[in-house]
Amino acid sequence: MTKTIKTVSFAAAAILVVIICTFLIIRQTHENVLSKETVVKKVEASYEGKVTKATQSKDKKTYDITLENPKGTYFVKADAISADILSMNRVKAVNPSAMTEKEAEHLALERVPGTVKKQTRQSQVATYTIQKEDGKTYEVKVDMQAKTVLSADQISSKDQQKTPITKKEAKTIAERKTGGTADDADLEESEGTLIFEVDVDLPDNKEATVKINAYTGKVANIVYED
């Protein structure tokens, strides 16, 4: 009986020691945990961004942080004691703003110095026809979103005939054919051919739409409206 009591007492004492040690370890760990503000400051300084959200995990061992900087939005997991970064994943990339047409033209002229003879644009790709001082002509394509030159190819004399006329030239042709004043001109593709549709205001308060082949400059159709 006495032996049994001693065994139980010893087991109880051992369990108590384990509980006390565990409590002390947890307490010490919690005392060493850095504050949210401290961890946030370190993360912002390290990655030159702004922390928009920071929460501590249930076990108090890590901080889950949302960071935004010029490169995008990141989900960061930081150690609560050392503030070391345990993991970092970009969840959203920043979509850079596209360059202006003036900036795109400047980039094209950097690649091929000369005089811009014609310029067209489809979506985010601007195309420039540039003539150099030696008389050679090049077609330069610029990706305005990526801010890079896609291609810069010399145009042969035969290919130059395929270069579209400008919007200004299309308006002049429409005015000459109708005797009115061109209001607007849109470049569209029809059955594989580029067509300028030019809206013209006529002297008798009427309007007309003139369709012009963008390659040849010939009038394909004129529609008069009341």
Curated annotation (Swiss-Prot):
One Pfam family it belongs to: PepSY
Membrane-topology descriptor: Single-pass membrane protein
Organism: Bacillus subtilis (strain 168)
Keyword Membrane: yes
Transmembrane region(s): 5-25
Compartments (UniProt record): Cell membrane
Claim: Oxidoreductase is one of the keywords in the record: no
Signal peptide (residue range): none
Keywords: Cell membrane, Membrane, Transmembrane, Transmembrane helix
Protein's name in the database: Uncharacterized membrane protein YkoI
A GO cellular component entry from the record: plasma membrane
